[in-house]
Every structure is written in C-alpha cells, then in structure tokens.
Amino acid sequence: MENVGTAASATPKRARARNRRGEGGRLREDIVAAAVALLDEAGDERAITLRSVARRVGIAAPSIYPHFPDQPAIMLAVVQREFAELRDSLRAAVEKAGADPRKRLYAVCGTYLDYAGAHPERYRTMFGGLWMPDLDGSSLTEADLAALGDETMRILVDALAACAADGQSASTDPPSDAVALWLGLHGLAHQRAVSPAFPWPEDIADRIITALAHLNA
C-alpha cells in the first residue's frame, strides 16, 4: 500500500484548463473525485489535504476555497458522495430482487457487504469518523454529520418493515431492529477487512441477517 507521504507528494498533473463561465460545478466535482482517488491510493484520509487535492486536479490551492472553505468540507463531500453511491446501489438491489420482502432484505444486506469489501478505504472513512474535526474549528455543523447515512438506513428499515408486514419477520420494532442488523453487518464488514485470514463460515452473513432481523424459518 502506498504510504501517505508518497500519495500526497505524487507528481502533479498538468495545469488544468480554466473553466468557462457557469462551469464551477465541474471543478467542485473534480475536487471531490481527486480526494476520493487520493483516499483509494493511500488508504488514509490524512493524504487528503488542500495542497494534495489541488495538485491532483491541476489547480492552485486557493482555487479550492470558492467551493470548499477547508479540508473537512472536502472530506464531508467525499463521504456524502460515497453514501449516495451506496444508496443508489441499495435501491438498485431492491428493484432487482423483485417483490418478495425477504429477498429484498437479503439483497440490501448483501449489497452493503459487497460495497464494504470492494471499497475498504472509503467504507472505513464513511464510518470510522477519524476525519471528523472539532466542530468549533471547522466549517462543518452537527447537522451535516448527523445526516450522514440517513437514506441508506431508511432503505434497510423499509426492507425489514416489509418483512414484518408480510409475516416473514417477528420484528415488532423494525427501526430499532434495523439498527441492530446494521451493527451486525458493520461488525462483519470491519472484521472481514482486518482479519482476512480468519476462517469465516460461508453462511455467516445469512446467520447474522436471520437472527438480527428476526426472520421466520
């Protein structure tokens, strides 16, 4: 894995062509994409600095400020982007699974675990909280952080609630049970990442889902 210093000091890209009027949104997207690329390469959010991002995009660091007032704002945008990607993947999985509530719940959980396995650095950053600054010293607000993951959790809650309504789950409190299920999935995703040599049972995910979602036999 490339170390943080190497990623941050990588050869800068050629100077970026100046945006035409009305294309400022494209630069914002490029800044976020550059930050994600740095995270993927270094495996450490500390590689994402104003200078390293500017170098990757091919702009001067001050050009970032009209779009992001500080580094935490860039990190927030990265995490928001990844949650949106996860949300879209979960929605697609639900649609593909068909009408059966149990299949939909398994599709949501399986897609969640697949995302965590395919993007370990991004996943860790989304849920690790290591990048979150002291709110008094950054442009972020408590509301910014509290909203992260709301839509993805709602998909899980709805999937479990549908199982309960269909008589396939004994859950009497789908929102709370969905939180417990998420904790189980998150724990599995984390442990798979840090203990890849452990002999995980092939059906461990199914066991977690069945138990924590209170699915009927």
Model-derived regions, located:
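Hydrophobic alpha-helical connector segments
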Residues: 91-121, 178-181
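N-terminal intrinsically disordered/low-complexity leader segments
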Residues: 1-26, 37
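Generic hydrophobic, amphipathic alpha-helix propensity
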Residues: 27-36, 53, 78-86, 90, ...
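Amphipathic C-terminal alpha-helical segment
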Residues: 115, 158, 162, 181-199, ...
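Helix-turn-helix
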Residues: 30, 41-73, 77
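Amphipathic alpha-helical linker/stalk segments
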Residues: 81-105, 137-150
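Amphipathic alpha-helical packing segments from all-alpha helical-bundle domains
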Residues: 91, 133-166, 175-179, 206-213
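Amphipathic alpha-helical segments used for helix-helix packing
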Residues: 118-139, 190, 194, 198
